[in-house]
Design a protein with these regions (language model features):
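Ligand-binding cleft/hinge of the Venus flytrap
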Residues: 85-86, 99-109, 189-209, 237-242
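Periplasmic-binding protein-like
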Residues: 155-161, 240-279, 300-315
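Short loop->beta-strand "edge-of-pocket" segments that line small-molecule binding or catalytic clefts
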Residues: 71-78, 82, 173-191, 224
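Extended ligand-binding regions for polar small-molecule ligands
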Residues: 50, 96-105, 166, 174, ...
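Flexible hinge/capping segments at coil-to-helix
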Residues: 65, 163-182
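A ligand-binding cleft/hinge motif common to bilobed small-molecule-binding domains
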Residues: 136-145, 196-197, 224-258
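N-terminal secretory signal peptides
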Residues: 1-26, 37-44
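Extracytoplasmic small-molecule ligand-binding "clamshell" domains
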Residues: 57-135, 145
Length: 315
């Protein structure tokens, strides 16, 4: 999952690498090219009146407007497994599927994707290009100054893609540093910070566009490992004849274990919508339905969490 300014219900991925790569091409390139018109048309069409600014009085009135319109626009960034368009042109992913269930309970029948680059999600949200960020976005103190978050729906450790058999014995960043391993990770990924905290120089990291490029780098021997979120790594390494994923581990940041939590983001004026969303999220968490919704996207019970946005925002 991405950290910086650029920072993821049939099963979303097949059981082989070809499917992962095919899905990825649809979510990175054709998502923006093929659906830009769709997203723009939707934003200017039936949902256009959601562009009316809310004063934030009494927590904002966006929830009422969404109920009246029957549709909510979701900002997505085309990242498997968090929020993307599948091979058939359908919106799916951990966050959109969860959004469908929660907004249905809130009286909003439909969700509509608005594809954008990851770094444009928060600016686009605050510019009212869409109503909520549904991209599995990590909750960080910096982001908490720009948007308000629901409580996290998952907590994610790191993992590596390594060559089959893990010949260098790479299980943590400390292992990688000791073995002088060459590391690749994705553009804007939180794992850049995690590797730097472990002692790597950022200039020594190989930055690739995405997890598929990272897998290719490991398979070709250009790097010793690719690091990403545990779920991303599991999915991209599945079916590879030359690479495998390691067990998840929690990185150390400022000397303390840190597993990031991903959540939905809302405009700061829309506390009423955020609170209503949170109430339904907590019900799903307690009933176990939350896990059943996200499990098809590669999530495990170990990645479910009771963390709050307040904890992650640092206030």
């Amino acid at each position: 999952m991405r950290l910086g300014s650029r920072a993821a219900m049939a099963p979303p991925l097949g059981n082989d690498l070809h499917t992962v790569r095919t899905e990825h091409r649809h979510t990175r390139r054709s998502l923006l090219a093929g659906l830009a018109a769709f997203g723009a048309a939707g934003a200017l069409g039936a949902t256009g009146c959601t562009r009316v600014a809310s004063s934030g009085k009494n927590g904002g009135d966006l929830l009422d407007r969404l109920r009246a319109q029957g549709v909510v626009r979701l900002g997505i960034a085309g990242e498997i497994p968090f929020g993307y368009i599948d091979r058939d042109g359908n919106l799916t992913g951990e966050a959109p599927e969860l959004a469908r269930v929660i907004f249905k309970r809130l009286g909003v029948d439909r969700v509509q994707p608005v594809p954008t680059e990851f770094g444009s999600l928060i600016p686009g949200l605050n510019a009212q290009q869409f109503d909520v960020v549904a991209a599995g976005m990590y909750v960080t103190p910096d982001r908490c100054e720009q948007v308000i978050f629901a409580d996290p729906d998952y907590r994610m450790p790191d993992a590596f893609v390594v060559r089959k058999g893990n010949p260098l014995g790479l299980h943590t960043y400390a292992d990688a540093l000791r073995r002088h391993a060459k590391i690749a990770t994705g553009t804007g990924y939180a794992q850049i910070q995690h590797a730097v905290e472990a002692g790597f120089k950022e200039s020594d990291l190989v930055i690739v566009p995405d997890q598929v490029a990272g897998l290719n780098a490991v398979e070709s021997g250009r790097v010793d490992l690719f690091t990403g979120t545990a779920v991303t790594v599991r999915l991209v390494a599945r079916g590879s004849a030359k690479a495998e994923s390691t067990k998840p581990f929690v990185a150390l940041v400022d000397g303390k274990p840190k597993a990031d939590g991903g959540a939905f983001a809302f405009r700061p004026t829309e506390t009423r919508l955020r609170d209503a969303f949170n109430a339904e999220l907590h019900k799903l968490r307690r009933s176990g339905e939350l896990y059943r919704i996200v499990r098809p996207f590669g999530f495990t019970r170990a990645e479910m969490t009771t963390l709050t946005a307040k904890e992650l925002c640092g206030s």
